[in-house]
From Swiss-Prot:
UniProt organism field: Xanthomonas campestris pv. campestris (strain ATCC 33913 / DSM 3586 / NCPPB 528 / LMG 568 / P 25)
Any GO CC annotation of this UniProt entry: cytosol
Protein name: Thymidine kinase
Taxonomic lineage of the native organism: Bacteria, Pseudomonadati, Pseudomonadota, Gammaproteobacteria, Lysobacterales
GO BP term, example: thymidine metabolic process
Disulfide feature: none
Length: 209
């Protein structure tokens, strides 16, 4: 039975790596997948989904006006049966788009796997995450670690000096240089202005090609 899944975490927990591995698992078994990625996230190039450890795949882009059920129906009409839809950066979905993805599951009987942040740099839910938490059939946390050694559940936006940024737009695309995953206790401390956090994380070594 097809389901709507939401895999959520703080920054740098390996969400995109997990998405790409899931897509690979389907394709390895001869099943066709569609990866959806927001237009506003073009760090790796438009329509390219890339993880921090070097995995990459092409995806279809969407913005807040894209009707996702129609997008998937057109994909099937053009390319044949589809076995799974995977959504990167799902926090950027609108509530209407989350509902459309639930229709992909319920009407087309295609599983939809969404990967995204739960909360923004203020500790507040993104719209997409809010409605995925409400409507998804299955919820799973992808865990990562705070510099304190505790589980990281929050994401803080920092400036060049490592101090918390408390104002600004909710959506600001950036990677390790802008955001740090922390525990709730550390989030409270840095938001109070107690200390700083080095925004740069050690690059992961890649195996030789």
């Amino acid at each position: 039975m097809a389901k709507l899944y939401f895999y959520y975490s703080a920054m740098n927990a390996g969400k995109t790596t997990t998405l790409l591995q899931s897509a690979h698992n389907y394709r390895e078994r001869g099943m066709r997948t569609s990866i959806l990625t927001p237009k506003l996230d073009h760090r790796a190039g438009s329509g390219v989904v890339a993880s921090r450890i070097g995995l990459r795949a092409d995806g279809q882009t969407f913005d807040r006006q894209t009707e996702l059920l129609q997008l998937i129906e057109r994909d099937i009409a053009a390319h044949g049966p589809l076995h799974c839809v995977l959504v990167d950066e799902a926090q950027f979905l609108s509530s209407a788009q989350v509902w459309q993805l639930s229709e992909v599951v319920d009407r087309l009987r295609i599983p939809v796997l969404c990967y995204g942040l739960r909360t923004d740099f203020r500790g507040e839910l993104f719209e997409g995450s809010q409605f995925l938490l409400a409507w998804a059939d299955e919820l799973e946390e992808i865990k990562t670690i705070c510099h304190s050694g505790s589980k990281a559940t929050m994401t803080v936006r920092v400036d060049a000096q490592g101090h918390a940024v408390q104002d600004g737009p909710q959506v600001e695309i950036g990677g390790n240089e802008r955001y740090v995953s922390v525990s709730r206790a550390e989030f409270k401390k840095i938001m109070r202005g107690e200390g700083r956090i080095d925004p740069l994380q050690i690059a992961l070594p890649l195996p030789p090609a």
